[in-house]
Amino acid sequence: MTENGLGHWERVLNVDTMNPNVKRVEYAVRGPVVQRAVQIEKELKEGVKKPFTEVIKANIGDAHAMGQKPITFFRQVIALCVYPDLLEDKFPEDAKNRARRILQACGGGSLGAYSASSGIEVIRQDVAKYIERRDGGIPSNPDNIYLSSGASDAIVTMLKLLTSGEGKTRTGVMISIPQYPLYSAALAELAAVQISYCLDEDKCWSLDVNELRRAVKAGREHCNPRAICIINPGNPTGQVQSRQCIEDVIRFAAEEHLFLMADEVYQDNVYAEGCQFHSFKKVLFEMGPEYSSVVELASFHSTSKCYMGECGFRGGYMEVINMDPEVKLQLTKLVSVQLCPSVPGQALLDLVVNPPQPDEPSYDTFIKERTANLHILSEKAKMTAQVLNTVPGIHCNPVQGAMYTFPRLTLPEKAINAAKEKEQAPDMFYCMKLLEETGICLVPGSGFGQRDGTYHFRMTILPATEKLKIVLEKIREFHKRFTEEFS
């Protein structure tokens, strides 16, 4: 017995009593390689000698962390909203007008006030107008739009709505392999079933409807398939799906009675000649009422990617189409539990969907910065694929869009065996060794899912051009040494 009379005290919450679903969650983008990179950065600051002077994080799609400059107009308006006294200063008039409009829609005229749970009404109206412009006039109803703290928040919310059942009645959700680990992590946390369909690497990561049919048939043997998720442009694979592919997916969703989730956060990031972004909503409505009146769709967008790269503001939205009115009430209830999305994120989203117009003073600077950001990304996408494809043992598909490449590695058998001895996936072994020897931080392909017997890494194209050249050269040199060491 202890002095307080409580005897042996065992924690209420420990690894045996915690939610078992949380233990099943994995998120490779910030996994062991990244955690080791953080340790190495601390060691470098402490003066520990390394064969390099800095860690270059090419693991995550965080444009500003990689040195991309913010869009001037966006930051001016946000500054005015955060500190309205600046409205008396010498900011451009259109920036002041935009800030006043946003502040008038905020409680107490402040970004510090809660908003409506689905987001500030005038911003939802602006999002609807943006979608209409993007989709050639197809109507968008602000009541179908829910603002969110980044697209990830909205995606998880939608998965919560979809998840139900036990045993063979558990909800199954179709996700691509390779996939963005948000999806597998959320499904694990919600105790839903992941139904994997494979993209075709030999055809530039294209999507084959026959593979979808195979996957859903296999899924029905142990769960209840209810949804399919598509990332377009692709993460981690950098492909842009054709219009025909999108039509095929919509028909498949209708035939199999599946809810369709379209992750379109990279919609401005299209680089390859002959490629074009087509929104699922636009294609759905152009296919006619046979599909547009019945297929249930949620599409997602974000302030974090494209030319903006404003990850930290956590701005995003989802638009729902053909959702049961009673389910919409439940969705509204669910988002209200979190009170509201980030209000500064909502303000930034408003600027993304309602940027400066040609007759406004900030327009020329905005267009110049937007065009420059996208052009630089396009050049880096081409350069990355070109350089990696000169390395024997690395094969890289064209980076058609998004911010990543997902090259295939040919690894010596000796390296694969060495990885097994360390109880690591071979590409984890490769990426960890790359980090320790060069300071380059990548994400192993095994964290995204891949066909058995294949190995990859995901690398962002976001580092500044000169730094990206260094990254690519270091990878080239390392891969040669690695292959020689384990041959």
Task: For each feature predicted by the language model, list its residue ranges.
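PLP-dependent class I/II
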Residues: 1-118, 122-487
